[in-house]
UniProtKB/Swiss-Prot annotation:
It is found in: Nucleus. Residues 29-60 are annotated as: Basic motif. Phosphorylated by AMPK. Interacts with CREB1; regulates CREB1 phosphorylation, stability and transcriptional activity. Residues 10-21 have a biased composition (Basic residues). Belongs to the bZIP family. ATF subfamily. Residues 23-86 form the bZIP domain. Probable regulator of CREB1 transcriptional activity which is involved in adipose cells differentiation. May also play a regulatory role in the cell cycle. Identification in a chromosomal region frequently deleted in various cancers suggests that it might act as a tumor suppressor. Residues 1-24, 93-120 are annotated as: Disordered. It comes from Homo sapiens (Human). GO terms for cellular component: chromatin; nucleus. This is cAMP-responsive element-binding protein-like 2. CDD domains: bZIP_CREBL2 (cd14709).
């Protein structure tokens, strides 16, 4: 007796179950693979460019911080010798001027708000 079954007018032979893979166009599959590889290489190139830019910007930041640290070391050595560096004097006088400007502007604003509050 034959093990094949008739279902819907078609003869099914026993064997693997499930969908049978359709005939794959090998040229199309190869082209898709090549395209995917091209896209992968392009993404990799962009990623490496981004990382290189990130590294160079961090290196520039490190150099700037080293210069700033060296400047602060020089200031500390000068202050240990009893000298006040001119940069620190400029910073201090600049802060004093800013404080005096802020205080004068606060008094001016306070005067305006008091005048406005008493006008009703």
């Amino acid at each position: 007796m034959d093990d094949s079954k008739v279902v819907g007018g078609k003869v099914k032979k026993p064997g693997k179950r499930g969908r049978k893979p359709a005939k794959i166009d090998l040229k199309a599959k190869l082209e898709r693979s090549r395209q995917s590889a091209r896209e992968c290489r392009a993404r990799k190139k962009l990623r490496y460019q981004y990382l290189e830019e990130l590294v160079s910007s961090r290196e520039r930041a490190i150099c700037a911080l080293r210069e700033e640290l060296e400047m602060y070391k020089q200031w500390c050595m000068a202050m240990d010798q009893g000298k006040i560096p001119s940069e620190i004097k400029a910073l201090l006088t600049g802060e004093e001027q800013n404080k005096s400007q802020q205080n004068s502007s606060r008094h001016t604003k306070a005067g305006k708000t008091d005048a406005n509050s008493n006008s009703w």
